[in-house]
Amino acid sequence: MHIGKKNYPNLITSFRMNLKKIILNHDRFSHPERWKTNALLRFTFVYIKFLFDLMIIKNPLRMVGKTYRDAVTALNSLQSNYANIMAIRQTGDRKNTMTLLEMHEWSRRIGYSASDFNKLNIVHITGTKGKGSTAAFTSSILGQYKEQLPRIGLYTSPHLKSVRERIRINGEPISEEKFAKYFFEVWDRLDSTTSSLDKFPHMIPGSKPGYFKFLTLLSFHTFIQEDCKSCVYEVGVGGELDSTNIIEKPIVCGVTLLGIDHTFMLGDTIEEIAWNKGGIFKSGAPAFTVEKQPPQGLTILKERAEERKTTLTEVPSFKQLENVKLGIAGEFQKSNASLAVMLASEILHTSNILEEKIKCSSNASIPEKFIIGLQNTKWEXRCQVLEKGKNVWYIDGAHTKDSMVAASTWFRDTVRLSKRKKILLFNQQSRDANALVNNLYSSVSPEITFDDVIFTTNVTWKSGSYSADLVSMNTSQEDVEKLKVQESLVKNWNKIDDNRAKTHVTASIEEANELIETLYDEPADIFVTGSLHLVGGLLVVFDRIDVK
């Protein structure tokens, strides 16, 4: 039976929903306590779900064309669905210890060994808050040495508007043409090769790695083909078992501020999270971290460095940066910029571009090219200010407690003296949204009071569709459609704000933007936060308006 491309996603969705109903309605699956006592039950359920996902990933879409749109469609078919994620969470199984073995095997199948990636002279960065900004700062500094380093690769996640943002060269996302070219080179190599089913029983012919693993493979392939002289890699989640940890010999490693996030995968204590982050440390590659780490976390990081036979150095905020206007706003970015200085220094010294490393001292002298690199760093949706018509938008994709406090403090301090109306646009679909709103509220009060508060979904368009690059299958579609999270946020806000602000709920980002434009004739300051998906969707909406 031939399944057309247009009908395929609908059939998949229907099958998933029916499977979920069967499982959840079954008596054994409806009692959570039985998960803890019946190991066979847990294994059976996850295995069923695992096989089902293989059915989805096996030949996800047979592509007729090989355009950028075709590549995005194929890539989206590799996402894990919400029901499967929740099923695995219910088992309490945090670790996929096969990840790195699988990455080595996938790499072999596309023509590489892990040692091939050593030529990329990699900076490997992990952390909870600020690792993307630190990666951007580091890349921008290295980009000032174009004669010696003509091409600098940068791999980050997630993306805001286009998946191409994850794979950059000299600070710019690769073109749609190059993305499609390299994407299908990897895709076709995987199709034309096989794995030993004795060693990898789930790697059946036609199967593909998941979304993030595929993009990680694609980044290595792209940077090697483009002859990048140095690359900056941001960890996806954690470090120890992250797909990027196939990197065997980084030049230097960095750890930004630690906090509580991704607890299902990393653990719910700072110690557990630090242990995972420290998993990227490698023998012979010095490691640096920001100052003012949580003491318990710093202790674990030091232990991990000793275990991996390397050094860990705390980086103070450099005094020379105190009066420098960084390309990414926010006072807290000074520590990320300082860390980036040390990471770039290691790369440039190892490459014989700097005669001496920069001293890790607050009074150290920083070269002018480093300062220019920090000033010229561009990183959308992190403490970003945009003027649109009569309104000023303050945008930050904060989605953890610490980042929310930092972003909210930045907004408060920036608009404290402004007499404009204040509007909040917020969403967080998969974490504890109400806790984040409480962090936001306590950070801006009492200096800032919002006149209007809008809770929206991450759906891009009022037609109910997403921008193709922003399709996400890891949230509950039922919750999105019924606006469950948004209605809960309204109740919570009215309680903590004593019903002072007018609250609104919209089903899409486009509708939220249209509502904001009609609320007041006078100018307003608008704070957008809670989710990088929300921020990315808003920027896509802005782009369409600008084209019109």
Curated annotation (Swiss-Prot):
Localization per record: Mitochondrion inner membrane; Mitochondrion matrix; Cytoplasm
Amino acids binding Mg(2+) 2: 262
Catalytic activity reported: (6S)-5,6,7,8-tetrahydrofolyl-(gamma-L-Glu)(n) + L-glutamate + ATP = (6S)-5,6,7,8-tetrahydrofolyl-(gamma-L-Glu)(n+1) + ADP + phosphate + H(+)
GO cellular component: cytosol; mitochondrial inner membrane; mitochondrial matrix
Origin superkingdom: Eukaryota
Keyword NADP carried by entry: no
Alphabetic keyword roster: ATP-binding, Cytoplasm, Ligase, Magnesium, Membrane, Metal-binding, Mitochondrion, Mitochondrion inner membrane, Nucleotide-binding, One-carbon metabolism
GO terms for biological process, alphabetical: one-carbon metabolic process
Molecular-function annotations in GO: ATP binding; metal ion binding; tetrahydrofolylpolyglutamate synthase activity
InterPro entries assigned to the protein according to its UniProt record, in alphabetical order: Folylpolyglutamate_synth (IPR001645), Folylpolyglutamate_synth_CS (IPR018109), Folylpolyglutamate_synth_euk (IPR023600), Mur-like_cat_sf (IPR036565), Mur_ligase_C_dom_sf (IPR036615)
Residues that, per the record, bind ATP: 130-133, 382, 396
Chain positions recorded as Mg(2+) 1 binding sites: 157, 234
Known function: Catalyzes conversion of folates to polyglutamate derivatives allowing concentration of folate compounds in the cell and the intracellular retention of these cofactors, which are important substrates for most of the folate-dependent enzymes that are involved in one-carbon transfer reactions involved in purine, pyrimidine and amino acid synthesis. Required for methionine synthesis and maintenance of intact mitochondrial DNA. Involved in telomere maintenance.
Family that this chain belongs to: Belongs to the folylpolyglutamate synthase family.
Name of this protein: Folylpolyglutamate synthase
Organism: Saccharomyces cerevisiae (strain FostersB)
